Structure formats: structure tokens, C-alpha cells
């Protein structure tokens, strides 16, 4: 699921070992309510027509931000066009409609029925026929049998899951032996999520969570994925003004190549392979 508010970290982020007890039912209801409200704001003919195509309309910085995530995920997955792809946490289709340009078979799921309904309407409006949108819980993909997909991708979703580990185990269950995972994590070492957002008065999402790269690797490995690798990307926020976007793109190109700098990027992308063992 993709949303605007993020966690404001005045204290170090909770690690797997430090997690406080969570009422998972309450947390999921809160998330569903949030997205139901967001979907209601967009559920109109003007939004369906906006952008002149299936892609969800957003500002240039947001489109660049999403493009970079998807481009990186495609490179890390290294999957052919005929691969069966599952996207978990698709929201209204922000990344989904980019994936449909690459893959012949995309299934996209989200916890929010309202988000899925909106994504379906957008796909129908723009005649995107190679995607199936379904309501599903990332931590319990009960509608899918084992080994259903060649690739599982998830963007801006694990950060909101009560148990990212449980979700990643489900991702592995529905991936075929040899299947690939690519998921993203907001980087706890990025200044944007703490002092910068505080200075801008941006309200945190109550259930958001940040991850250091080592923690993301450990969680993915702990869920049974092998050959786990991470990559730091993006210093550009979706909120960057149009006039500054060119400068921030340059910052990304340079910063992502410098080891001492890239560790402070906004996003940690993680990939893994399902070795088929149970």
C-alpha cells in the first residue's frame, strides 16, 4: 500500500526483537479505514480520466519515485515477460500499471476492498486486460495455492504489516521453487523520515515502521528466502517540487554510487530466491 504519511522517528526504530505487542486486528482495521477514506476522495470520473492512460496520476516527483522503484525491482527480479507476477499491497495500482507494461500476467492484491474496486475501475476504463485485482491480506494469502507465482513483488507494504516476517513467509509459500522476491523497506538511516519530516510538519502514519538494511536482510532470510541481496536507492522524495526534480535526480545518480552516502538513501530494496525447501 502506498500512502503519503510516514513514520516520524524521534527515537530509534523498533527492531524485530524490540517490537511492542500489537493488536493486529485493530491495526488492520485502522489501515483499511485509512485507505477507504483515500479511495472515496478519488472515486470519481475526473480521477479515472486523469493522466490520459492507466497509470495513476501523480506529480512528476512521485512518478519518478515510483519509476525508480519499479525499474530497480525489475532488474533485481530478472524475470521474463511471461512470468506470473503477484504484487502484494497494490493500493490503487500505482506500481501495478507499470508492471503490466512488462509482464503478461499480473495479479495484484490489497487489504482494502475500496482500493481494489478503484483499481479495477481504472483498469477497465483504460482496457488493461493482463491484470487481476483481488482483496487479500499480505499475511494470509489464502486464495492462492502453493507455488502459484514466478515473482512476488511488494512496494510500501511490509512497513505497515503487523508481522513482516509472516507476510514474507506467505510470499515464499505462493512462489514456485526458484521463484523470486523483490520488496522495499523505508530506510531507518535516511534523515528524511526523522528531522526533515518533523521540520516540515508532516504527520506520521501511526502504524509505519522503518528498517535498517541489515534488519531487512535478516527478516527476509528469516522467512526462508535465499540469496538475499539489498540495494539502496532514492534520495528524492515524492514531495520534491517540480523545479527541484532535476537536481534531485542528479543527487540520486551520484549518491547511490557512494558507499558512505547511499546508506542514507530513502529506500532499501531487497531480493531473494525461493529454494523450494519447506
Model-derived features: positions:
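Conserved beta-strand signature within the Rossmann-like core of class I S-adenosyl-L-methionine
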Residues: 179-185
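Class I SAM-dependent methyltransferase SAM/SAH-binding core
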Residues: 92-140
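A C-terminal cap/extension of S-adenosyl-L-methionine-dependent methyltransferases
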Residues: 182, 195-200, 218, 228-278
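A short acidic, Gly/Pro-enriched loop at the edge of an enzyme's catalytic core
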Residues: 139-151
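A short glycine-rich, Lys/Arg-flanked "PGG" loop and its adjoining helix->strand segment in the class I
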Residues: 165-177
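Conserved class I S-adenosyl-L-methionine
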Residues: 5-8, 13-79, 252
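Short, glycine-/aromatic-enriched active-site segment of Class I SAM-dependent methyltransferases
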Residues: 187-207
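Short alpha-helix
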Residues: 208-223
Amino acid at each position: 500500500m502506498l500512502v503519503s504519511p510516514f513514520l516520524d522517528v524521534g527515537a530509534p526504530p523498533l527492531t524485530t526483537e524490540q517490537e511492542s505487542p500489537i493488536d493486529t486486528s485493530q491495526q488492520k482495521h485502522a489501515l483499511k479505514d485509512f485507505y477507504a477514506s483515500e479511495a472515496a476522495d478519488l472515486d470519481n470520473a475526473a480521477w479515472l480520466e486523469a493522466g490520459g492512460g492507466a497509470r495513476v496520476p501523480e506529480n512528476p516527483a512521485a512518478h519518478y519515485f515510483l519509476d525508480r522503484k519499479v525499474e530497480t525491482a525489475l532488474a533485481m527480479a530478472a524475470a521474463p515477460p511471461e512470468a506470473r507476477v503477484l504484487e502484494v499491497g497494490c493500493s490503487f495500482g500505482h506500481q501495478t500499471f507499470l508492471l503490466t507494461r512488462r509482464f503478461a500476467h499480473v495479479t495484484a492484491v490489497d487489504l482494502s476492498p475500496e482500493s481494489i474496486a478503484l483499481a479495477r475501475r481504472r483498469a477497465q476504463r483504460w482496457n488493461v486486460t493482463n491484470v487481476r485485482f483481488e482483496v487479500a491480506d499480505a499475511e494470509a494469502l489464502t486464495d492462492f495455492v502453493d507455488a502459484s507465482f514466478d515473482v512476488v513483488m511488494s512496494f510500501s507494504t511490509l512497513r505497515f504489516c503487523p508481522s513482516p516476517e509472516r507476510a514474507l513467509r506467505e510470499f515464499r509459500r505462493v512462489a514456485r521453487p526458484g521463484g523470486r522476491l523483490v520488496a522495499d523497506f523505508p530506510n531507518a538511516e535516511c534523515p528524511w523520515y526523522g528531522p526533515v519530516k518533523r521540520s516540515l510538519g508532516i504527520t506520521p502514519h501511526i502504524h509505519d515502521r522503518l528498517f535498517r538494511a541489515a534488519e531487512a536482510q535478516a527478516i527476509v532470510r528469516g522467512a526462508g528466502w535465499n540469496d538475499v541481496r539489498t540495494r539502496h536507492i532514492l534520495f528524492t522524495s515524492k514531495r520534491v517540487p517540480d523545479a527541484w526534480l532535476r537536481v534531485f535526480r542528479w543527487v540520486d545518480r551520484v549518491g547511490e554510487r557512494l558507499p558512505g552516502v547511499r546508506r542514507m538513501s530513502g529506500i532499501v530494496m531487497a531480493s531473494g530466491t525461493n529454494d523450494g525447501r519447506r
